[in-house]
Structure formats: structure tokens, C-alpha cells
């Protein structure tokens, strides 16, 4: 996986937050301050992103399962698109408390989603009184919005990729409680102590998020091919 400083620069990965909003623990990853904005050291970003890509590729080769998390507006569509591309699960609308720490309860909601989808597909809902059908369709839309990305998740993920550590605090806490490794884009207001694999970068700009998540996804896809080939060899 080749990552150049030019492409990081072009995507605005170097722009951090206002200096007054910084987390001092991010100091090692900050290159300078310009007009009250912290500038992230892209040499470190390139190195750490390369290492993260190698790690996810190796994990995918071992058949590990990934969960992508990013519920902010700028990240939502990228998270869904890239997760689907590499066969990962995702949460891109709202993190329901307990998705990981109370997985067995959440699974009942997932089963409810599947049940309602089946009833919609088979025309069962059309046979119900209009008011009842409308209520069930509203429930279906809500469940889809929140849980569609983990509909086929049968167990807890092995690795979680997070965009915006500050926003996804509950997801971070649940991962840490369960000892699930976190890979996270860390802006200058984040805490590197709360992640296992840090990628210093702008977690607000769409182009920055897309570049980093796409690089990780490409590596997962590459690793998954190796896993599929190894498995077919043993069949």
C-alpha cells in the first residue's frame, strides 16, 4: 500500500482543530500551528496509516471481522459504502448503547428487523389494516436506519474502525470494556491513549475521511482475497 504525502496534503488530512481545542496528548503528532489551527505532521500520518493498512490486511488474511463506526454527517455514506465493499459491518447513523456490551439483547432487535423485512418482501404487511401496517413500516425504517449495517453480524467484531473518537465515545468505551482493538482517525482534539492503532488526521473533512477509510478498505479487501484463497486450498 503506497501512501504519499502529496495525496494526504491534497485531501486536507493535515488540518487539525483550533489550537485552543487541542488535547495535549496529541502533541507528538502536531507539526505546527498556523493562524490558530494545529497542523498535523503528515510524515507520521503516512507512516502510521501504512502500518494500520498492513495490520488490517494481515487481520483480514486471518479471517478477522471488522466493524466500521462513523455517525457524523460527513462520514456516514463513506462508512456504509466502504464497509460494504470489503464485507465489514458498520454503524453510520446512531450508536445504540450496548451494541457490543449488550450484544445478545441487540440481536433480538436485529432479528426483529429481519422478520419485518421478510413480512414486507412477502406482501404480508399489505394484508394488514392500514394503520397497523403503517406502524410496522415505521418500526422497520427505524430499525433499518440504526441496525442495517450489522444485520448479518453473528458475533462480536475482532476490530473496530472509528471516525471521530470524541463523537463515538460510547463505542470507544464498549470496545475498551470488551478488549476489542480500536483503529481510529485521531484529530488534534482526541486522546491517543484510548485507541490501539492511531492514524493522526483530519476527522471532519469528507476528502480526508474518504482517503483514510478507502486505504484501510483496500487493504482489508486485499487481505480477504488471501483468506479466501487459503480456505479454498484446504477444501
From Swiss-Prot:
Swiss-Prot/TrEMBL keywords: Chloroplast, Plastid, Ribonucleoprotein, Ribosomal protein
Pfam families with a match to the protein in the record: Ribosomal_S2 (PF00318)
Family, per entry: Belongs to the universal ribosomal protein uS2 family.
GO terms (BP aspect): translation
Superkingdom in the source lineage: Eukaryota
Localization annotation: Plastid, Chloroplast
GO cellular component: chloroplast; mitochondrial small ribosomal subunit
Protein's UniProt name: Small ribosomal subunit protein uS2c
Record keyword Plastid present: yes
Keyword Ribosomal protein: yes
Main location (coarse class): plastid
Record-level Gene Ontology MF annotations: structural constituent of ribosome
Amino acid at each position: 500500500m503506497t501512501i504519499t504525502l502529496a495525496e494526504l496534503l491534497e485531501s486536507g488530512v493535515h488540518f487539525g482543530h483550533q489550537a485552543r481545542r487541542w488535547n495535549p496528548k496529541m502533541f507528538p503528532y502536531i507539526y505546527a500551528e498556523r493562524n490558530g489551527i494545529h497542523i498535523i505532521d503528515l510524515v507520521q500520518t503516512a507512516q502510521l496509516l501504512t502500518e494500520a493498512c498492513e495490520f488490517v490486511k494481515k487481520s483480514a488474511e486471518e479471517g478477522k471481522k471488522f466493524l466500521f463506526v462513523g455517525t457524523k454527517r460527513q462520514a456516514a455514506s463513506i462508512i456504509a459504502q466502504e464497509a460494504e465493499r470489503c464485507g465489514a459491518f458498520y454503524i453510520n447513523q446512531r450508536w445504540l448503547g450496548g451494541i457490543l456490551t449488550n450484544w445478545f439483547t441487540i440481536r433480538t432487535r436485529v432479528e426483529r428487523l429481519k422478520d419485518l423485512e421478510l413480512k414486507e418482501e412477502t406482501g404480508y404487511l399489505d394484508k394488514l389494516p392500514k394503520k397497523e401496517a403503517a406502524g410496522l413500516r415505521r418500526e422497520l425504517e427505524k430499525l433499518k436506519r440504526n441496525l442495517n449495517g450489522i444485520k448479518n453480524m453473528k458475533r462480536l467484531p475482532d476490530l473496530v474502525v472509528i471516525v471521530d473518537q470524541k463523537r463515538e465515545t460510547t463505542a470507544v468505551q464498549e470496545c475498551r470494556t470488551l478488549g476489542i482493538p480500536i483503529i481510529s482517525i485521531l484529530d488534534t482534539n482526541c486522546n491517543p491513549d484510548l485507541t490501539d492503532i492511531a492514524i493522526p488526521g483530519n476527522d471532519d473533512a469528507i476528502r480526508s475521511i474518504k482517503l483514510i477509510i478507502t486505504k484501510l478498505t483496500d487493504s482489508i479487501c486485499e487481505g480477504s482475497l488471501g483468506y479466501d484463497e487459503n480456505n479454498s486450498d484446504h477444501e
